Regions:
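Walker B catalytic acidic pair
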Residues: 213
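Active-site-proximal or metal-binding-adjacent scaffold patches in catalytic folds
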Residues: 1-208, 217-259
């Protein structure tokens, strides 16, 4: 049996993540799908975000199995890609060019002023960036990340005291991340992770996610008892869940474009 045939049929599980691309004819165009062999994956998975399509293979899945999975889901893939292409995102920010800054469900006008150090502040006119003459794209991405992290922590700090009574304990730590699909999570040690994209959208939706994760301190599951705890603290949670179904992809796409 040739080496290629062995790889196609029963590849040796890799110790690290491996990436390549596979081309797929889809409707009237040929697209590239990122193929990722991940030792942590348990099943074949096809996903789509603003960067394109991704096929994840577990260690013992063959390339043939992956390509067959792509063929079986080509109609679904075409629909998902059309949805992402139709998203109305603000123009990407460029150093020194006026634009808009997404924050708490609004698009704030953003202006630039010369300064010694990169700094972003909010005032009555919108956002204002103090910008050094040698600032570049990396400086802007770092500035935006620091800004959104500070705004996210400010919101959590404002809401958290209201919900602490009745909880067995406070979260042990707060981590802010760029999450691909989740909005938040609570680890067994009590540390909470939240998606930075939350601060771009509706504050009520963000507050719901915070309450959702806090309730996992009481019920580490999604049982009826868990949803009862959520209902007691945030009765409008269904409306906010619907909001994420409508706007979630757009929020995550905006964050990735910004950072």
């Amino acid at each position: 049996m040739s080496r290629l045939l062995r790889r196609l049929i029963s590849p040796t599980p890799p110790a690290t993540v491996q990436r390549d691309t596979v081309r797929l004819r889809l409707e009237d165009a040929e697209i590239e799908v990122l193929r990722v062999r991940d030792p942590r994956a348990r099943r074949i998975k096809l996903s789509v975000d603003e960067r394109g399509a991704r096929l994840t293979l577990p260690p013992r899945a063959s390339l043939v199995m992956g390509e067959r999975f792509l063929e079986q889901h080509r109609d679904w893939l075409a629909v998902q890609l059309r949805q992402y292409q139709g998203q109305d995102l603000p123009a990407a920010l460029q150093p020194g060019v006026e634009g808009v800054l997404p924050l708490r469900g609004e698009l704030l006008p953003l202006r630039w002023q010369e300064g010694r150090f990169a700094r972003l502040e909010i005032d009555e006119h919108g956002g204002c960036v103090q910008w050094p003459t040698r600032g570049g794209d990396a400086t802007l991405r770092r500035l935006l990340r620091e800004f959104y992290e500070a705004q996210t922590r400010a919101d959590v700090g404002r809401w958290l005291p209201k919900y602490l009574p009745g909880l067995p304990r406070a979260p042990s730590r707060l981590r802010l991340k760029v999450m691909s699909s989740q909005w938040g999570s609570l680890a067994p040690d009590g540390s909470m992770a939240l998606d930075l994209a939350l601060v771009l959208g509706s504050p009520q939706a963000f507050e719901y996610v915070l309450v959702h994760e806090l309730c996992h301190l009481i019920q580490p599951n999604h049982s009826p008892a868990f949803w009862h705890e959520v209902e007691q603290r945030f009765p409008a949670w269904r409306e906010q869940r619907d909001y994420f179904q409508r706007e979630g992809r757009r929020l995550k796409a905006m964050l990735r474009q910004l950072l």
